[in-house]
């Protein structure tokens, strides 16, 4: 389910044409700052869950997330992939309730959770 956080971490990348990467317009967003700020994290999560307003970068993330999940972040920049890993690790270990809400919305049939099962297990703190 690296998918959803992938997108979260991509920090709102823009839709790319086939064969290209998503826009790096938002790659300067400090993912760790977002994760450590309840206000910022809540804003992104509420945007992704259709529970709140979206900032421009939040909207791009929301629009890009389904594609990133479907195609294993194949259009993500290296910075976006790294950010996605950071976000996934944080949500899985520190905010499992948010992870679950996002999973219900973006992976209701557990397709991606099954596809990324090994990766998810590897980030869990035991």
Swiss-Prot record:
A single cellular component GO annotation: extracellular region
Cell compartment(s), UniProt: Secreted
Gene3D superfamilies in UniProt: Insect odorant-binding protein A10/Ejaculatory bulb-specific protein 3
InterPro entries the UniProt entry points to: A10/PebIII (IPR005055), OS_D_A10/PebIII_sf (IPR036682)
Record flagged with keyword Cytoplasm: no
Source organism, top-level taxon: Eukaryota
Location, primary (coarse class): secreted
Region forming the signal peptide: 1-18
Keywords associated with the record: Allergen, Secreted, Signal
Family that this chain belongs to: Belongs to the insect A10/OS-D protein family.
Matching PANTHER family: CHEMOSENSORY PROTEIN-RELATED (PTHR11257), GEO07322P1 (PTHR11257:SF13)
Name of the protein this chain belongs to: Allergen Tha p 1
Organism: Thaumetopoea pityocampa (Pine processionary moth)
């Amino acid at each position: 389910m690296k998918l959803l956080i992938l997108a979260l971490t991509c920090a709102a990348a823009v839709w790319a044409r086939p064969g290209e990467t998503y826009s790096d317009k938002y790659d300067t967003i400090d993912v760790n700052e977002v994760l450590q700020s309840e206000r910022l994290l809540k804003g992104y999560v509420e945007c992704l869950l259709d529970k709140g307003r979206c900032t421009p970068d939040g909207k791009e993330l929301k629009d890009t997330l389904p594609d990133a999940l479907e195609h294993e972040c194949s259009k993500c920049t290296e910075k976006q992939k790294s950010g996605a890993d950071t976000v996934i690790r944080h949500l899985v270990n520190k905010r499992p309730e948010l992870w679950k809400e996002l999973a219900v919305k973006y992976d209701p049939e557990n397709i991606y959770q099954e596809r990324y099962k090994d990766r998810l297990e590897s980030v869990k703190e035991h």
